[in-house]
Amino acid sequence: FGAGLTKRAYQLNVSAFLNASKQYLVNNDSWESNKFDLEEYSDEQKIIFCEGFRVIDNPLFNHLPFAPARGETLQIKTMVKTPMSNGSWYLPDGVGCALIGSTWDHENILSGPTKEGKNEIIEKCNFIKIQEEQIEEGFSGVRSGTRDRNPIIGVHPTKNNYFLFNGFGSRGTSTIPYYSKKMIDFIIHKKE
């Protein structure tokens, strides 16, 4: 079945972005690295819970239809410089490597990279030929998804100072800027 070519797309270096964001907050005395304890906050303070997949452990919101999923990717050595996708994807970095992926596993979310995941990725990325010696490293992460694949944002039904901003899954980097503005407008400007 062929593959599609991805043109004029951008890729966010999420690690670099998160590190720069953290440094900005540290520099502006707005970063705390303590374990969050709800008891330390008054009932008047507004709190936005953005916990990723760990929201499933939050007694305020764990009844909601969250469906975290572990995903795996591989970094391979390659000289192919064209991004491609056929449901799986291939993203070159321009310096002789590429990321390929990915998998979905709703059962073993904390297991890390697996041989089964590696084999699945290689099989699904059949639009490029991958030799074992090309594989440099396997990665895994947990998507904070929901059963219907839509984020869950809004106010708690009985505690109007607690808000939830979660469940973005694999589309978080592209949708969070839009939804964060909507959330701030809702909290600060009372816009729905």
What are these regions (language model features)?
Residues 10, 29-44:
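A conserved short coil-to-beta-strand element within the FAD-binding core of flavoproteins
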Residues 1-28:
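Flavin (FAD/FMN) cofactor-binding and adjacent substrate-gating region
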Residues 3-7, 100, 163-165:
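Generic recognition of long tandem-repeat/solenoid scaffolds
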Residues 79-159:
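Active-site lid/adjacent beta-loop-alpha segment flanking the redox-cofactor pocket in flavoenzymes
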Residues 20, 134-192:
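C-terminal catalytic lobe of FAD-dependent flavoproteins
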Residues 25, 29, 129, 183-191:
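Short, hydrophobic alpha-helical segments
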